[in-house]
């Protein structure tokens, strides 16, 4: 083993190799040196584990060149989503409609009217680009956009209830993902949490009995990422609004996924729409931009002007503000809601409402193409998709996909081979077989899958 360590070339020796000199013509010296160190460290580790029997200089040089090429790849890059999870948090959640692309590029590479009022020739507000649209679509007095829904809740609580009590049902103290919990957000806001009711049952008198002179807000949190079923009771939004008005206390509802389309029209379960909650009379409503709305990551706050004006003046708003790329993409999405059919134009909603017959046809076409590749077996199968992103937690969507088996690879090997490509193909393992759910495949993904399988089978030969 010691002999193998001694035979490993030094960084300087590798730098003098002709193959590396060629690489240095197109890469910074420090980058190349770092890659050499990383490769040598890997070899030392392999020697420690007894995996290296002899030192092959040519192989080391090849590994260095490969490491340099790997460094050039973007870390954040496109993937093929074959999981069937529409709002896959790890894969970027909502996809933008195609109409967003042109405007996004325009604003990214040109100066813009971000905070400039062209009519008055003076400074404007960055929020005006989407506030008018939100007010028009939702029939609200005012709106504000921050960088995510947790930030929206934080800002609202900090503005309206810092140092005072916020009453919320015990059954609504949710965790919103990444171990962030409503009580923790409330603590950071400076508001004082006052839990009422029980996990499964909360009544109007629970809220009424908890009201004191220190009560600043009545909060309702929509449990969009789970359901409590069975022996349960919760008060309706309208009832909470009535209590708030009777005791002159503002009401707020965190809707989470923030759908603006009645999903019952497409055979899906009822998910409260933003419009319904606004119509119920809630003073402040918060929801996400990148879930069922189908836009960018954002926390959207709508409601009474007097409360939102206070939030706009809060120094936290500056810390939580969104950039021009978020605003232009959100504006495009909101214009689709106003001017056309969002279910046809917004990818999230289009995938969510896709008919099983459409998905079967899509799977059959892909299966036919895959079967032309030697050493690959596949078939069309019925599977279930999920909406993901903490929305529609009880709903499994009937879908279709194809199974993949490649001669010479077991299930785990094939899944990994597809996953580690330049364009990663993320699949599911269903009943021990690699499976691609076609619901979440985009135009052009089929070609990526076919190319990957052709290369993989070439390796097998």
From Swiss-Prot:
- Magnesium as a keyword? no
* Listed pathway(s): Aminoacyl-tRNA biosynthesis; selenocysteinyl-tRNA(Sec) biosynthesis; selenocysteinyl-tRNA(Sec) from L-seryl-tRNA(Sec) (bacterial route): step 1/1
The GO annotation for biological process reads: conversion of seryl-tRNAsec to selenocys-tRNAsec; selenocysteine incorporation
**The entry's keywords:** Cytoplasm, Protein biosynthesis, Pyridoxal phosphate, Selenium, Transferase
Q: What cofactors are annotated for this protein? A: pyridoxal 5'-phosphate
Subcellular localization is given as:
Cytoplasm
Q: Which InterPro entries match?
A: PyrdxlP-dep_Trfase, PyrdxlP-dep_Trfase_major, SelA-like, SelA_trans, SelA_trans_N_dom
| Entry keyword annotation includes Transferase | yes
E.C. code: 2.9.1.1
Which NCBIfam families does the UniProt entry name for this protein?
Answer: selA
Protein name in the entry: L-seryl-tRNA(Sec) selenium transferase
Gene designation per UniProt = selA
């Amino acid at each position: 083993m010691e002999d193998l360590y001694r035979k490993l070339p030094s960084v300087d020796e590798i730098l003098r190799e002709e193959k590396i000199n060629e690489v240095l013509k197109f890469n910074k010296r420090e980058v190349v040196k770092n890659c050499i160190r990383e490769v040598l460290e890997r070899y030392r580790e392999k020697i420690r584990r007894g995996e290296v029997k002899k030192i092959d200089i040519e192989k080391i040089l090849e590994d260095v060149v490969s490491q340099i090429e790997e460094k050039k790849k973007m870390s954040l890059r496109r993937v093929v989503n074959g999981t069937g999870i529409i709002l896959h948090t790890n894969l970027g959640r909502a996809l933008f409609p195609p109409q967003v692309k042109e405007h996004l590029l325009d604003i990214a590479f040109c100066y813009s009217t971000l905070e400039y009022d062209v009519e008055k020739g003076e400074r404007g507000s960055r929020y005006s680009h989407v506030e008018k649209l939100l007010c028009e679509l939702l029939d609200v007095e005012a709106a504000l956009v921050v960088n995510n829904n947790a930030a929206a809740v934080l800002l609202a609580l900090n503005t309206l209830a810092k140092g005072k009590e916020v009453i919320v049902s015990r059954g609504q103290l949710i965790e919103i993902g990444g171990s962030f919990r409503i009580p923790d957000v409330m603590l950071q806001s400076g508001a004082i949490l006052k839990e009422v009711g029980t996990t499964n049952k909360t009544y109007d008198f629970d809220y009424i009995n908890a009201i004191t002179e220190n009560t600043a807000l009545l909060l309702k949190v929509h449990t969009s990422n789970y359901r409590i079923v069975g022996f349960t009771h919760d008060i309706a939004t309208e009832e909470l609004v009535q209590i708030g008005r009777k005791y002159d206390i503002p009401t707020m509802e965190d809707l989470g996924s923030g759908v603006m389309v009645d999903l019952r029209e497409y055979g899906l379960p009822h998910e409260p729409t933003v419009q319904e909650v606004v119509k119920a009379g809630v003073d402040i409503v918060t929801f996400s931009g990148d879930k069922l709305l189908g836009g960018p990551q954002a926390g959207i706050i709508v409601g009474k002007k007097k409360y939102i004006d206070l939030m706009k003046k809060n120094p936290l708003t500056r810390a939580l503000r969104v950039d021009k790329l978020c605003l232009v993409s959100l504006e495009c999405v909101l214009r689709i809601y106003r001017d056309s059919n969002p279910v046809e134009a917004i990818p999230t909603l289009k995938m969510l409402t896709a008919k099983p017959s459409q998905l079967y046809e899509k799977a059959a076409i892909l299966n036919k193409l895959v079967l032309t590749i030697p050493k690959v077996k596949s078939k069309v199968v019925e599977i279930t998709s999920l909406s993901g992103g903490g929305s529609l937690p009880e709903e499994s969507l009937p879908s279709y996909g194809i199974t993949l088996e490649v001669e010479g690879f077991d299930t785990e090997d094939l899944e990994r081979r597809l996953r580690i490509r330049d364009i990663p193909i993320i699949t599911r393992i269903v009943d021990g077989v690699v499976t691609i759910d076609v619901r979440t495949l985009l135009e052009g993904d089929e070609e990526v899958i076919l190319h990957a399988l052709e290369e993989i089978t070439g390796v097998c030969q």
